[in-house]
C-alpha cells in the first residue's frame, strides 16, 4: 500500500504576485504525516497558519483564495496541483505575502523544485477515497459542469469553450498523475486582452505580463488602446497586426489553455485533503465550480468516514477457504472467514457470507435471527490473524493469539443473507512479536462493527 510522503528537504522560490505585484518569497517545508497542506503567513504577527482545504476557500475570482479569520492567501492552485500530482501528502508552506508568486504562470517551477529535493516515505498509509457513485455539480450561468464517476484510477478530462475567434473549443486529458510533469505542468494561465482593463480597474493582475500568462487577442482594438493597456500594466508596448496570442514565448502545447484549466482542476481538488480514485469530466471548469465539487466530496467523506472496500464477487480471491485452512487452526463451526480478496503489506480485506444455516441462528434468536456481536468480532479477529501471518516468511509455523480487544462498537444488525466484508489495517509496525490492528466490518456500504486488536505471534509448529 502506498505510504504518505513529504519533501526530503525544504526549497524556496521568489517571484512577483500576479494580483498584488509584490516581490514574494515562498518556502516549502517537510511536514509530519497526517498534517496535509498548511500555509503559514510569516509576514503577519503570530505567523498564522491556514489549512489548505476546500472549506476554507473564501473567494474564487481569478484564482483560489483561502481565508481563516482575517488572514487570507490567494493564487495557491498551481502549487497545490504540483504537490498533489507529484505525490506530496504533507507540506508546510511559508509565504511572506497575501498570495503565492505567479512565477511563469504554470506549475513547472514547483514541479522542478519538488523533483530536485525529492520525497521521503512516511509511516502512515495514504488513505484514498474511492468514488462509488456518480457525483455532479453545475452552474447554468457559466455552463460549467463537473461530473465525477467511479474508476480504478484518477483521471481527468477537460473541455473548454469560449465565444472567441482565437480560443473556441479545446480538450485536454490526464490518464495518470505520473503524466502531469510532461503533459500539464508547463501550461500557463491565460487572459483575454478584452478583460485586461476590467481586471486592472478591479485592482487585479498588477504583476501580470507577457512572460507569466498567455494573452489572447481575439477582438480588434485600435493601436492607441493597446498602448494604453500596455502602459497600465507597465509592460513594453507591442505592435499587433492580427488576432492570436501575443506573448514573448510561443505556445508550449497547441491546447495549452485547456491543459491549464486541467491544472487548475487538480489544484482546486487537492484541497479535498485526500487522494481520490475516480474519473473527472469537466466542462468549462473554473475555480468556483471546482471548489463546489471539492466541498461536495469532502462532505461525502465526512458522512462516510469509514469507507467500505470495493467487493467484486466475480474476482478470484487472494486466499480461498482451502488456503485459509492451511493458515488458521479454526474449523466448522468456528471458522468464520470464507475468503481473502485483497491483501497488502499492512492491510487485508476478507469476506464472510452469512447464511441462514449458521448454527447460532436457531438460538440467537428464535423468530429474529441476528449474528452475535462477539462472533462478528471473532470473524474480524480471524481475518486479522491472516494479516499478521501474511507478514511472515513461513506463516504455517506460527499461531496468532489475541491479547486485547478494545474500542468495540456495533453499528447495525447482521442477519441471514448479509455479506460481511472486513478490512483490517496495522496501526503500527509489529514489534517483539506483537501486532496492533484496527478492524472494520461492513454490510454493503454500511459499517456494522469496528474494533482494535492486539495480537501475539508465536512460533509453535514444525
From Swiss-Prot:
Keyword Lipid biosynthesis: yes
Active site, UniProt feature: 287, 364
Cofactor: Zn(2+)
EC number(s) recorded for this UniProt protein: 3.5.1.108, 4.2.1.59
Keywords: Cytoplasm, Hydrolase, Lipid A biosynthesis, Lipid biosynthesis, Lipid metabolism, Lyase, Metal-binding, Multifunctional enzyme, Zinc
Renumbered residue ranges of the record's region UDP-3-O-acyl-N-acetylglucosamine deacetylase: 1-302
3-hydroxyacyl-[acyl-carrier-protein] dehydratase: annotated segments: 303-462
Family: In the N-terminal section; belongs to the LpxC family.
This protein's name: Bifunctional enzyme LpxC/FabZ
Amino acid at each position: 500500500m502506498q505510504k504518505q510522503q513529504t519533501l526530503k528537504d525544504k526549497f524556496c522560490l521568489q517571484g512577483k504576485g500576479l494580483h498584488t505585484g509584490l516581490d514574494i518569497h515562498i518556502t516549502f517545508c517537510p511536514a509530519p504525516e497526517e498534517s496535509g497542506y498548511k500555509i503559514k503567513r510569516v509576514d503577519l504577527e503570530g505567523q498564522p497558519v491556514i489549512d489548505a482545504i476546500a472549506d476554507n476557500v473564501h473567494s474564487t475570482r481569478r484564482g483560489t483564495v483561502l481565508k481563516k479569520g482575517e488572514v487570507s492567501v490567494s493564487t495557491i492552485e498551481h502549487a497545490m496541483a504540483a504537490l498533489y500530482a507529484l505525490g506530496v501528502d504533507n507540506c508546510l508552506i511559508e509565504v511572506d505575502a497575501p498570495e503565492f508568486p505567479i512565477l511563469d504562470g504554470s506549475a513547472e517551477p514547483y514541479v522542478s523544485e519538488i523533483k530536485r529535493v525529492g520525497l521521503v516515505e512516511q509511516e502512515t498509509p495514504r488513505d484514498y477515497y474511492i468514488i462509488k457513485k456518480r457525483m455532479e455539480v453545475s452552474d447554468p450561468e457559466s455552463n460549467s459542469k463537473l461530473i465525477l464517476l467511479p474508476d480504478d484510477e484518477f483521471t481527468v478530462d477537460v473541455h473548454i469553450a469560449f465565444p472567441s475567434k482565437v480560443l473556441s473549443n479545446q480538450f485536454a486529458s490526464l490518464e495518470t498523475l505520473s503524466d502531469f510533469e510532461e503533459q500539464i505542468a508547463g501550461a500557463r494561465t491565460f487572459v483575454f486582452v478584452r478583460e485586461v482593463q476590467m481586471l486592472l480597474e478591479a485592482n487585479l493582475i498588477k504583476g501580470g505580463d507577457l512572460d507569466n500568462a498567455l494573452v489572447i487577442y481575439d477582438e480588434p482594438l485600435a493601436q492607441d488602446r493597446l498602448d494604453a493597456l500596455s502602459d497600465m500594466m507597465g509592460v513594453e508596448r507591442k505592435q499587433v497586426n492580427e488576432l492570436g496570442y501575443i506573448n514573448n514565448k510561443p505556445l508550449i502545447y497547441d491546447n495549452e489553455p485547456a491543459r491549464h484549466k486541467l491544472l487548475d482542476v487538480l489544484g482546486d481538488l487537492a484541497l479535498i485533503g485526500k487522494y481520490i480514485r475516480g474519473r473527472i469530466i469537466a466542462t468549462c471548469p473554473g475555480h468556483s465550480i471546482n471548489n463546489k465539487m471539492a466541498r461536495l466530496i469532502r462532505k461525502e467523506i465526512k458522512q462516510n468516514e469509514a469507507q467500505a472496500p470495493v467487493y467484486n464477487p466475480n474476482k478470484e480471491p487472494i486466499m480461498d477457504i482451502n488456503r485459509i485452512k492451511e493458515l488458521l487452526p479454526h474449523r466448522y463451526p468456528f471458522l468464520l472467514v470464507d475468503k481473502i480478496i485483497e491483501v497488502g503489506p499492512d492491510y487485508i480485506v476478507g469476506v464472510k457470507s452469512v447464511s441462514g444455516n449458521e448454527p447460532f441462528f436457531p438460538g440467537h434468536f428464535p423468530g429474529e435471527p441476528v449474528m452475535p456481536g462477539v462472533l462478528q468480532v471473532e470473524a474480524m479477529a480471524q481475518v486479522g490473524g491472516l494479516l499478521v501471518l501474511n507478514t511472515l516468511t513461513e506463516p504455517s509455523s506460527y499461531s496468532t493469539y489475541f491479547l486485547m480487544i478494545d474500542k468495540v462498537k456495533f453499528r447495525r444488525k447482521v442477519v441471514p443473507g448479509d455479506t460481511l466484508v472486513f478490512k483490517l489495517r496495522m496501526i503500527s509496525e509489529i514489534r517483539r512479536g506483537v501486532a496492533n490492528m484496527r478492524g472494520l466490518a461492513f454490510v454493503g456500504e454500511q459499517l456494522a462493527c469496528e474494533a482494535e486488536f492486539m495480537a501475539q505471534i508465536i512460533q509453535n509448529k514444525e
